[in-house]
């Protein structure tokens, strides 16, 4: 299939990130402002139905020949029709279905049977007190149990850790060893200059350089070539363990990003950090209009991440 939607840098959309809901059962400090924490406990957001999501995904797949769908949130496991949705996506013929989750209520075996191939699990601390300070919830053990369940279900598992100076940078090597012992690839994420952190993220910013310095003080490490469109750069230890760093600020991957975002209202965004929604719910039976709006979304892509309020 010839993709009619390509920009001057050769970028196109091959991965669809679907934000199933804005709600979450955690209130992590890099995601939720302290003034909003109490609101997250009883917040229930209306989302698209499974039928609507599948109709949109089928239309986008027809135009873009998508390779991957990644289900995100908020927390995607809060979406009540998650398993039927995954089953429906599998039936569209899209090659890979992935998910990013905190794994606190993970139905791993049924998700695997429905068609989920891999899961990135957010884990920002091993020590319970640090985990609570970040997430404002006592759910560390549920996440650790979720990691075990995902591995038992033979899902491909990765761990995502947002590293924050003065908050959980003292957890970095503990998390590294936890992942290494289980042969799970861990990716350390730089804090992003987004949302309420736009004007003051430097206070807790812990750079790729600092992450590499911390790990290389304990292991001999070698950088690997970055795959095209990959979010992370990877290194290996001298005994063959592979880990990654997502350098959202130091070295963003915008120049060959192939991701399209779909939110829970039926809007698309060409840049994951963009604040300007483009609705496609009103034109799902009009392929030419879909293409025009996808071209508009592609024009939102930056050549370098610059933050977003």
List each model region and its residues:
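Conserved, mostly hydrophobic/aromatic
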Residues: 20, 71, 266
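Radical SAM/AdoMet-radical enzyme domain recognition
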Residues: 50-71, 75-189
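A short acidic, helix-capping loop that chelates divalent metal ions and anchors anionic groups
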Residues: 38-43, 107, 127-134, 195-199, ...
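Accessory C-terminal segments flanking Radical SAM cores
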Residues: 195-308
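Pocket-edge positions in alpha/beta enzyme catalytic cores
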Residues: 8, 45-48, 74, 135, ...
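Glycine-centered loop/turn positions within well-structured domains
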Residues: 26, 128-129, 252, 278
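Canonical Radical SAM [4Fe-4S] cluster-binding loop centered on the CxxxCxxC motif
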Residues: 8-50, 64
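A detector for short, charged/polar N-terminal pre-domain segments
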Residues: 2-8
